[in-house]
Each structure stands twice: as C-alpha cells, then as structure tokens.
C-alpha cells in the first residue's frame, strides 16, 4: 500500500494520478474534505481507501498497524502563505509532519514530503538548499523551514529514505479548490471565461517566479521513491519567468482579451517574493535528468485541460 496525505488536494491528487499511471491503485488517500469541492480531484482516479486526516493522525500516534506500506507521500498541510494563525500552522504543518516522520522511521517506510520555496523568504539569488540561505517571510514559510531543519538533524541516522521537496510556484490541473491561492494561470483563465480582461498587478513584467508544472512535480516524487532518494531538494524548473509571460500564454490560447493592470496591494509589499528561481544543482546531481516544461508549454497544456 501507498499512503498519500493531502491526496485529494492539488499536488497530492497529481501524485495519485502518477501512481495510477505506473499501475498502483493500492493507495490510501488521507485528507480533510471539509472543503467538499476537493472530491472532484479523485473522481477519475483509482484508490483503495480514504481516511479522514484526524482519524489518521490518531492512528499514527497510537501506532496502529496499516499493513505493509511501500511509501508515504506527505502533501497534506495548510498551503496558504497568507494564513497568519501561527498555532494552527505549526500544529498542521510541523507537529503533524514530525509524527508522520517518526512513524516512517520506526518502520523504515520511505517518506517524501512537501517543503516550500517560501523557506527562502525575500532573497533574489542563491536559492540553495542550505540553512544560511533560508529566511522565511511568513508563518507558513517558517513552519516548512522548521520541519526541514528537523529533518536535517535526523537524515544522517535515517535507515530509510527521507526526502523533502521545496516546491516553487506549482500550477496546473486539480487546483481549482484553492480559491485565492490557485495559480495566476487559473485566475486569468477564469477572468477570460467571464468575459473580463485578465488582470495583473502593476509591475508584473518584473516579478519573476519559477513556475513549475504540477505533472513534472509528481514525476519527480515518483522518481525519488523508485530510486530511494534522501535529502532536501529544490523542485522548480531552474528558470524564472514573469507573470506577464503566464498571461501571454493564456491569451495565446484564448486568442482574445488584453491585459489590465491593477494596483499592488499594500499589505503584501513587505511579504511578497518578487523573484524565485530554483537552483537545481543538487537535484541534478542526485540523478534527475528529465526536462521541465516551460511556462509556454505548461500553460498551454493547462489551458487545454481547463477548457476541455
């Protein structure tokens, strides 16, 4: 059996899809379906069972026997960078992850988890997987940073794979439930379908992010499991592109509309990453050699999926 936490969420459901593609359907999805919209991400996927997150945590703490587990992909967390309830974030993103990590270590179960580029904070270069380059700007980033630090201390003694991925700007199918936290490509497409012009913040041609297509993210996770990879790795394309490039790709697909600019919100100015670009040196050195989709390629594929 394979367990995917956050399995009805954005990245989790894409990992389930990738597992299905290699013939694995013996999958336990763990999630919180309080946001009932997420169920649609599982409708076309094959899984063996579903477990509520709270029940799962209780079972983990109790040391319950789940039978033979080949791997746990831990994608379940609060991913809202705008969430400021620190107690909630630390419980949800840090304590839960520690419990699951030790459950895996005790049983030598390969453990793969979601970290984030938010751990780097507002830096404009050297996005390198080391403590000295990490300075998160928000509580979400701090919760991910602290778990990375916890893992770093444990890795030298771990007898089974423990692997974290610092996800950069992930976009693509199955993110529709995320609301305001969905990608800019999703929101621009929605605006055009409503008959509106797509809107970008002022200066968006200078805001550069490492936009990575979610199917590529899922493939890296599968590769890490199949190759028993351990460590903490950046997961982006290695190339920063502008929000304007995303908008241009959306407009190219729809063949209509023109970009409108709107004022940049004051409350985000000190907490906004204006540049991100994954340094892939460590991931490539570990053996991952497949190319990543560009913004033009990924956005085109995403638009075809959204407008199918």
Swiss-Prot record:
Keywords on this record?
Carbohydrate metabolism, Isomerase, NADP
InterPro entries the UniProt entry points to: Epimerase_deHydtase (IPR001509), Heptose_epim (IPR011912), NAD(P)-bd_dom_sf (IPR036291)
Tell me how the cofactor is bound.
Binds 1 NADP(+) per subunit.
Q: Name one GO biological process term.
A: ADP-L-glycero-beta-D-manno-heptose biosynthetic process
Enzyme Commission code(s) on record? 5.1.3.20
Q: What does this protein do?
A: Catalyzes the interconversion between ADP-D-glycero-beta-D-manno-heptose and ADP-L-glycero-beta-D-manno-heptose via an epimerization at carbon 6 of the heptose.
Q: What is known of its domains?
A: Contains a large N-terminal NADP-binding domain, and a smaller C-terminal substrate-binding domain.
Family, per entry: Belongs to the NAD(P)-dependent epimerase/dehydratase family. HldD subfamily.
Write the protein's name: ADP-L-glycero-D-manno-heptose-6-epimerase
Taxonomic lineage from the root: Bacteria, Pseudomonadati, Pseudomonadota, Gammaproteobacteria, Pasteurellales
What is the name of the gene encoding this protein?
hldD
């Amino acid at each position: 059996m394979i367990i995917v936490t956050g399995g009805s969420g954005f990245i989790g459901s894409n990992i389930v899809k990738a597992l299905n593609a290699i013939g694995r359907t013996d999958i336990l999805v763990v999630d919180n379906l309080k946001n009932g919209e997420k169920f649609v991400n599982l409708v076309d996927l094959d899984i063996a069972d579903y477990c509520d997150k709270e029940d799962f945590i209780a079972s983990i703490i109790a040391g319950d026997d789940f039978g033979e587990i080949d791997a746990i992909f831990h994608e379940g967390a609060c991913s809202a960078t705008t969430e400021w309830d620190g107690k909630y974030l630390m419980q949800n993103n840090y304590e839960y992850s520690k419990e699951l990590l030790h459950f895996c270590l005790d049983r030598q179960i390969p453990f793969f988890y979601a970290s984030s580029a938010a751990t780097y904070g507002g830096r404009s270069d050297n996005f390198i997987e080391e403590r000295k380059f990490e300075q998160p700007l928000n509580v979400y980033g701090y919760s991910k940073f602290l778990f990375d630090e916890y893992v770093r201390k444990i890795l030298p003694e771990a007898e089974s794979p423990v692997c974290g991925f610092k996800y950069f700007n992930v976009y693509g199918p199955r993110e529709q439930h995320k609301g305001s936290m969905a990608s800019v490509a999703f929101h621009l497409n929605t605006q055009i379908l409503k008959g509106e012009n797509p809107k970008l913040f002022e200066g968006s041609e200078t805001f550069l992010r490492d936009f990575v297509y979610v199917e590529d993210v899922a493939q890296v996770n599968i590769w890490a499991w199949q190759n028993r990879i351990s460590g903490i790795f950046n997961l982006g394309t290695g190339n920063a592109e502008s929000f304007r490039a995303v908008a241009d790709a959306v407009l190219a697909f729809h063949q209509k509309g023109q970009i409108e600019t709107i004022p940049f919100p004051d409350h985000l100015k000190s907490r906004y990453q204006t540049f991100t670009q994954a340094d892939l040196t460590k991931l490539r050195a570990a053996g991952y050699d497949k190319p990543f989709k560009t913004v033009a390629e990924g956005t085109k594929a995403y638009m075809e999926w959204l407008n199918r």
